[in-house]
C-alpha cells in the first residue's frame, strides 16, 4: 500500500507541476502570482527528483546479485 501511495504522490506532484507550467506559460498571472507559482514548481520538481532517485536506488538494490550490480535495461511492461 505504501508503494501505491508513493506512486500516487509522485503522479500528483507531476500533475500539479504540469498545471503550474501551463499557468506560467499562459502569461495571465501577475508577477507576484508568477513568482509564487515558480516557487511551488521548484518544490514540486525537487520532490519528483527525490522520488525518482529513491526509485532508482531501489531498482539497483533489487538488481544487486552476489555483491555485484547487474546492469539490466528497465522494462516497464515486465511483471514483477
Curated annotation (Swiss-Prot):
Q: Localized where?
A: Cytoplasm
Provide one Gene Ontology biological process annotation: DNA catabolic process
User: Organism source for this protein?
Assistant: Pseudomonas fluorescens (strain Pf0-1)
Which reaction is the catalytic activity of this chain?
Exonucleolytic cleavage in either 5'- to 3'- or 3'- to 5'-direction to yield nucleoside 5'-phosphates
Report one GO cellular component.
cytosol
Query: What is the protein named?
Result: Exodeoxyribonuclease 7 small subunit
Location, primary (coarse class): cytoplasm
| InterPro entries named in the record | Exonuc_VII_S, Exonuc_VII_ssu_sf
Q: Per its UniProt record, what Gene3D superfamilies does this chain match? A: Exonuclease VII, small subunit (1.10.287.1040)
* Pfam family name, one: Exonuc_VII_S
Keywords from the named record: Cytoplasm, Exonuclease, Hydrolase, Nuclease
EC number of the protein: 3.1.11.6
Q: What this chain does, per the record?
A: Bidirectionally degrades single-stranded DNA into large acid-insoluble oligonucleotides, which are then degraded further into small acid-soluble oligonucleotides.
Amino acid at each position: 500500500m505504501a508503494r501505491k501511495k508513493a506512486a500516487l504522490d509522485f503522479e500528483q506532484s507531476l500533475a500539479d507541476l504540469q498545471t503550474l507550467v501551463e499557468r506560467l506559460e499562459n502569461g495571465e498571472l501577475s508577477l507576484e502570482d508568477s513568482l509564487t507559482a515558480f516557487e511551488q514548481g521548484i518544490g514540486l520538481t525537487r520532490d519528483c527528483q527525490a522520488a525518482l532517485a529513491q526509485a532508482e536506488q531501489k531498482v539497483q538494490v533489487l538488481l544487486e546479485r552476489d555483491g555485484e550490480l547487474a546492469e539490466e535495461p528497465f522494462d516497464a511492461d515486465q511483471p514483477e
